[in-house]
Amino acid sequence: MKSLQKGFTLIELMIVVAIIGILAAFAIPAYNDYIARSQAAEGLTLADGLKVRISDHLESGECKGDANPASGSLGNDDKGKYALATIDGDYNKDAKTADEKNGCKVVITYGQGTAGEKISKLIVGKKLVLDQFVNGSYKYNEGETDLELKFIPNAVKN
């Protein structure tokens, strides 16, 4: 009486393991880039939150306000989970049209948020510097930013 074999041969199993290994070799770096991009996007959210503070400070003719909390000021920075956004720059009173820089900047430093060591190694310690325009929009400053271009949110690239 013949016995029927059921299951996979060793060669078939080795081929499946090799295919999974090849797929993982491509998927893991792509996933790491995805995580870094999503963490870098938090910086833009923090910068948007600082727009109101910058507008308030501009009424007194400066980008940065009094950083003394006792005076009722909200301060010049905002801390998120992965980044710290800080208002910087000197107000340009001559800027009038919407496409001119008003002199104010937001410096976003990754790795100084509340998450501590849980930030992607691809962006930790990097800076994204955003110039603010008269109309309130931001554009990244190519000369002062050391964050890789692929991690900079598209909203500030144009």
UniProtKB/Swiss-Prot annotation:
The modification N-methylphenylalanine is found at residue 8. It is found in: Fimbrium; Membrane. One of its GO terms (cellular component) is pilus. Signal peptide: none annotated. The keyword Phosphoprotein does not apply. It is a single-pass membrane protein. The chain crosses the membrane at residues 8-28. Keywords: Disulfide bond, Fimbrium, Membrane, Methylation, Transmembrane, Transmembrane helix. Its main location: other. GO terms for biological process: cell adhesion. InterPro entries: N_methyl_site, Pilin, Pilin-like, T4P/T2SS_Core. It comes from the Bacteria. The keyword Cytoplasm does not apply. Disulfide bonds join 63-104. Belongs to the N-Me-Phe pilin family. Major component of the type IV fimbriae that plays an essential role in twitching motility, natural transformation, and protease secretion. The pili are polar flexible filaments of about 5.4 nanometers diameter and 2.5 micrometers average length; they consist of only a single polypeptide chain arranged in a helical configuration of five subunits per turn in the assembled pilus. This is Type IV major fimbrial protein FimA. It comes from Dichelobacter nodosus.
